[in-house]
Amino acid sequence: MTSVLLLRLAGPLQSWGALARFDRRDTLNRPTKSGVSGLIAAALGLDRTDDLGALTDLRFAVRADRPGIAVRDFHIVGSGTYPLRPRDLITDHRRAEKAAAALDTSTGPVFGHLAARSVTKWYGAPKEVAPDPKTGVLLAGNTTRDAMMTTRWYLADAAFVAAVEHPDQDLLYRISDAVEHPKRLLWLGRKSCPPSGTISGGVHPGTAETILTTTALLPNATSPQPWAWIEATPGTPGAAQRTDQPVTYHPEGRTHTARWETRTRVSPEPTIGWDIIP
């Protein structure tokens, strides 16, 4: 027999990456298995290089009680002039020498106020910092850079109910305790998206399908029949493939494989309620 741990995933912003290049980072319309498994791994205190063990065997489902609103965050990074900072005098002595005259004659605040015009082609975040082959002093190999434009998508004011199913009830209880007393910082897809309030909805006997159907809607749910995505076995009629089954989160070789899921409307007839701090 299996049991299910309910997870309340709510916060001002969430972002569950479908595409993660530097210049464009999308979000799906619901949490991914990889993202939620990563949150669980962080709560348990696992390193990125650690084996995921039983976490790879969790069966995953998610219900969109409040889908939220997609918002775009547009950034322009680099180019232009930047205030001088103390670290800038350390990372390249050539720039420090050029700034010395202005530093010596300044009578007011210097750092954060002295602009780049006294230092030709100054850029405030040096790249390619390495020791000078002749002197051993740190030099910035790239002190100029064209502006970079990035677009990042988020879900605003969304709330989801995730269900993770496993036959080992003790494992689910450990996860339930860990998400409320995490060993590492937790986030909803990205580091800029912390969760709010209570996360654990408790451990309940049953399958992901039955528990999502018998669990009350979260406050301010937008529909009495929300959509749910439920992990399925390959070949299940109507199932779609998703490549978000985590294998490893190793920073030098993060790997995911395919899994299958179905999408359906659920009409909760609650016997399980929520005792949450928003």
What are these regions, as identified by a protein language model?
Residues 2-7, 24-29, 117-130:
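Generic detector of short, locally flexible boundary/turn motifs and exposed helical patches
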Residues 5, 60, 160:
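Residue-level detector of short, conserved catalytic/binding motifs and their immediate flanks
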Residues 1-21:
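N-terminal, Lys/Arg- and Ser/Thr-rich interaction peptides
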Residues 65-278:
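Internal, well-folded beta-alpha domain core
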Residues 1, 54-56, 154-156:
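Solvent-exposed loop and beta-edge segments used for protein-protein assembly and interaction
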Residues 20-102:
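Glycine/small-residue-rich interface belts in oligomeric ring/scaffold proteins
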Residues 12-13, 31-36, 132-137:
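N-terminal start-of-chain detector that recognizes signal peptides
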